[in-house]
């Protein structure tokens, strides 16, 4: 069981920060009167592998424990707190943190030079008690993948789009990719990294925007397209990052092009970070 170091001073989860709840990360030490008790659901997610490599999505929840990182937080006494959590405050924190799905978690460190990395995590919670009062919470965190993600990147271009992937993981990522047809016709979309992987959507209309999400295997259109699922060949665009063994150098440049001249290409993705939790 590993713990998070003292550099962590705050975090964001499900759109809220620990500081919003007047919390401060720390370690209170031992003593017979101090203990942790079970509360909420001890969540052990039943994950399935997604098409993006090494990433999981929960499909069911069972009640067992699995810990990747652990840390504790308490009330910030510098803000006039008596140090004890009321029953209502305990319930509010459980609702916030004890989620059955992997939600976005962003740590905040005292050293502002650390890069901002996001994870998708669930928490198991144990209130820490002293003389019958709740004084803090011990959190056990499980993430959806063995890596994190840097801030989301958005890129766009007409006809051609160059993506220099900054991921620290070799392999591929499924981006969210939108193509707006400049004219009626069949969209043929290629990546210079893997020219054999050709994405085709037939019978598109001028101004129609096709949005592809390979991670979840979805295709959407901005206009009525009666036979969309038959017109798509189900080859989702990928962003590649790998070692080119013939050249001995990193190969991270992806040049996307579409056959319909002037069509707008938009790509959104989050580069993979192996920075790790401090």
Feature locations, PLM:
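Long, hydrophobic/aromatic-enriched structural stretches that serve as scaffold segments
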Residues: 65-110
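Polar/acidic, low-complexity leader/linker segments enriched in S/T/G and N/D
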Residues: 1-47
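Oligomerization/assembly interface segments of phage tail-like spikes and tubes
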Residues: 51-84, 133-147, 250
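Intrinsically disordered, low-complexity segments enriched in serine, threonine, and glycine
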Residues: 149-278
């Amino acid at each position: 069981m590993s713990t998070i170091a003292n550099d962590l001073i705050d975090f964001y989860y499900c759109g809220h920060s620990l500081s919003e709840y007047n919390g401060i990360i720390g370690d209170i030490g031992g003593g017979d009167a101090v203990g942790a008790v079970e509360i909420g659901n001890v969540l052990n997610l039943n994950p399935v592998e997604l098409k993006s490599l090494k990433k999981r999505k929960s499909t069911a929840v069972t009640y067992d424990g699995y810990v990747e990182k652990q840390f504790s937080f308490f009330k910030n006494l510098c803000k006039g707190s008596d140090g004890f959590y009321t029953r209502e405050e305990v319930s509010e924190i459980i609702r916030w943190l004890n989620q059955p799905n992997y939600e976005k978690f962003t740590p905040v460190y005292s050293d502002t030079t650390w890069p901002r990395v996001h994870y998708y995590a669930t928490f198991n919670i144990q209130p820490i008690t002293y003389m019958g009062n709740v004084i803090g919470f011990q959190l056990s965190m499980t993430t959806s993948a063995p890596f994190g993600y840097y801030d989301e990147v958005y890129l766009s271009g007409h006809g051609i789009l160059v993506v220099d992937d900054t991921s620290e993981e070799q392999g591929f990522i499924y981006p969210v990719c939108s193509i707006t047809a400049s004219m009626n016709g069949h969209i043929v979309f290629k990546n210079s990294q893997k020219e054999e992987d050709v994405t085709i959507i037939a019978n598109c209309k001028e101004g129609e925007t096709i949005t592809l999400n390979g991670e979840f295997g979805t295709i959407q259109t901005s206009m009525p397209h009666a036979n969309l699922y038959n017109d798509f060949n189900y080859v989702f665009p990928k962003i590649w990052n790998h070692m080119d063994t013939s050249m001995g150098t990193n190969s991270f440049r992806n040049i996307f092009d579409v056959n319909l001249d002037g069509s707008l290409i938009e790509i959104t993705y989050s580069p993979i970070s192996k920075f790790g939790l401090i």
